Amino acid sequence: MKRNLMFKVLLMLMVGCFLSIDAFAQQMTVKGLVKDTTGEPIIGANVVVKGTTNGTITDFDGNFQLNANKGDIIVISFIGYQSQEVPAAPSLNILLKDDSQMLQDVVVIGYGTVKKNDATGSVTAIKAEEKNKGLTVSPQDMIAGKVAGVNVATSTGQPGGGSAIRIRGGSSLTASNDPLIVIDGVVMSSGSVEGLSNPLSSVNPTDIESFTVLKDASATAIYGSRASNGVIIITTKKGKTGSVKINYSGNVSVSTRKNKIDVMTGDEYRDFIINNPNATEAMITAVNLYPGVNTDWQDEVMRTAVSTEHNISAYGSVKDYLPYRVSFGYTNQNGILKTSNFERYTGSVSLTPKFFDDHLNMNLNAKGIYIKNQFADTGAVVGAVSFDPTKPVKNDNNKFGGYFTWTTDNDPNGTKASSAGVNPVSLLEMTDDQSKVKSFIGNAQFDYKVHFLPDLRLNLNVGMDYTKSDGDKYVDPSAPGSYGEDPLKSGSNYLYFYERRNTLLDFYAQYSKDFAKQHFDVMAGYSYQKYHYESNKETWYLSRNEENFGEKTSMNGDQQPAESQYVLLSFYGRLNYTAWDKYLLTFTLRDDASSRFAKNNRWGLFPSVALGWKMNEEAFLKKFKDLSELKLRLGWGITGQQDIQQGDYPYMSFWRYGQGGAMYPIYDESGNVKWVNVVSPSASSPDLKWEQTTTYNVGIDYGFFNNRINGSADFYIRDTKDLINAEVNVPAGTDFAEYVVANIGSLKNTGFEFAINAKPIVSSTWNWDLGFNVAWNKTEITKLDYNDNSDSPGKRFESTGGDGGKTIKIHSVGYAPGTYYVFEQVYDKNGNPMEGVYVDRNGDGEVTEKDLYQYHKPTADVIMGFNSKVSYKNWDFGFNGRASIGNYNYNGIAANAAIGTSAIFSNSALSNQPKAAFNTNFQGRQRQSDYYIQNASFLKIDNITLGYSFENFLQGAKYHGLSGRLYATVQNPITITPYDGLDPEVDGGMDRQVYPRPISVLFGVNINF
């Protein structure tokens, strides 16, 4: 037995020995040299055994060495070159060719594409893999901080809430400053509807393939009258030839409040009132109504919110000639403010068939979206700060739905105390505010390469953009905030609908030809676009009687039906010329007509010209082998603006009913009276015309080390004239109103942008990508109103929210739009602000409104974006951040705080105050003090993501397995700012009752089947 066992052991050892010898014989040391087509060694090229993590990189001489087995495949790759796969051998000489796809990478521009290397305008393209990760409910979330000069300000945490997008600071005062949005060739309607924040929200972010941002006029002028504020072009994902492939992505997120306003607790508030020497007996009685109650109202209106998202798509082709892609998505996002919710269903279909030997290419797209919104009253955010913390959420009195409500003399059976704060929880729970939105974007594009003249292409695009929003806001008749003493006029029901329809027809012909070393590309086209809007609003009183509780009784005011339409007609063309692949010329011209202007001003001509010089192609720079790209760009162009915001036909006068139902008596011969409605004409502006913006741009695109380091720098000057002003004073008696809409004004933008992207580490196991961009912008009004030398300081606007409608902002010549207009605060020797004491700036011996002055602005001087991603084998870690410098907010919550008895007690009701009020000890509110204009510069980390990628999971003999990625993200984790409010990022700078942005933790998965 022992001999048999020993024999078996010896046999196994011998077999193992032979196997080891065989394996050793199969293994080899692979040495090699990697060069480019010019014979130069390539430093840092990846060399890896295919299907393994066994790899290395080339040294400074292009050499490499690694161990491999006979039969292994060696993969050699480097940025900017085509990868090669070769069998393992002891000695290898590898020649990598330039990656023509990368060199000829195209970007989408207006009515066509251009090779990235040949672009002459200020154009930035972001591909799908470069977009921000994390919680991206709306497409604008993907590009925040990614593009130099583009500011995406998300100032609300409302589920589904949108962002204000500004490219190079905007170019208008009262007309729109939003960029033009183009989705798959459809120029979108501007503006928002209730429940759909902006045109970008019409697309599921997971369906987006790329963003292209056109910034200067040489790039945007092809869109003419709508391109003064830049253009964002979105291209969605298409089908691909081959078998069907299915992708699923989903995530679950948990969101919570990031911080809150520091206010007095119930016990602190009792002590404050009881120990206040100015407290009245009524105040002490009121604060002791509910002994021991400590209600944190901010906790009562906020919650931890759980949200989910699911997306599935399938793409492939039918018999190689009909590529397709279909997708479906579902999002359910709960807000941290109670009762708020955003639910969205999306679907898209894309077909890209080809016919006649690829001479006819079709691009058929359809995208649908259905949204259900549950809005929360954001007044509850401020109400939670100021409501008395010694009172319970509910009491035994069912008169107001059981919610504690201040009544006259605190009599449970009394009427609601006038001017008293409303229970913030009741604002949320006794209001049902919903909207349902349906949106559709579709187009059919036909691109025909003429058979007998293949250099000529004919392109026809027909499309539409349709949106309808139906809203129903129901406020319970017992709700404290709308409780009416008349039981038939209590509560409210606000009903509305809004429908817009945008139809489009574009046709252009394009001829491209190469002559020796010259390339010509000429395009000319025609566009017709019609916009139609229709809406209606009505508000009803409700019954509080038991027998018909909640039913409509009578209308509060009149119905407000509205319907309008306008048409844009355009002819456009473009010439691209390239000589010796070094010298570039682009010329565009667009002639636009808008029905929004009178016939004599209807047409506007918008030209542009741009020059490019690929300096790295010159002989004197060819010797610098590490210089991949150096291109100088010069651009000039004129763009327009016709998005007036004051109706579609301000040049016309309309007859309208008199205010307040005014009527006029008419008597017949018998003396009988007949009352008729008074009508009068509205003001008109027959000379109203386009805003025109002229832009000068100088830029450089650069790249080093085969574009491992690349970026751009731009300097621009943008002059806008004929600014459309909504309220231009006119002399009495010259029109039917005190103000008209007119072209009186101009402004100037000056700015600089810089962007850099780098790959510091590129290896078979480690990779590191870095990105940084910074932009400086200065905007100044250079002319305003009829007379720049008048005594008027400018156009004042933006109410403080109190003080009888006093304003806090102004448009003034020599200053940025919307500069704050305030009193200069005086401070005591200890640096504390003195209540009601301001600087007499004009020296007339008294402080009046003539002493108000321009002080800071809500827009930033400098904005920055940065990102980093490190990957090791299958793991990746990255973050994205932004910074804003020089922007100031009006802290309306602090400005509304005071500790005097008149501020905290009114008509039997007490109100809490932020503890910041004790920093000033102001007894009354000083809303126009510059003390409340606070530095809101910030540094934010928008998201931090850790991911793990996998492939060949569950692989079998007949199944290729699954590939995908698991990831975890923290959204909005870090904010560094000197600002005292909840969040420094406030669109427009007015921080009064903002829905706070939460901090979110997200877990997600992306799987390819």
PLM features: what roles do these ranges have?
Residues 1-355, 360-369, 377, 414, ...:
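Short, small/polar-rich motifs associated with maturation and membrane association
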Residues 140-144, 741-748, 788-820, 850, ...:
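C-terminal extracellular loops and terminal segments
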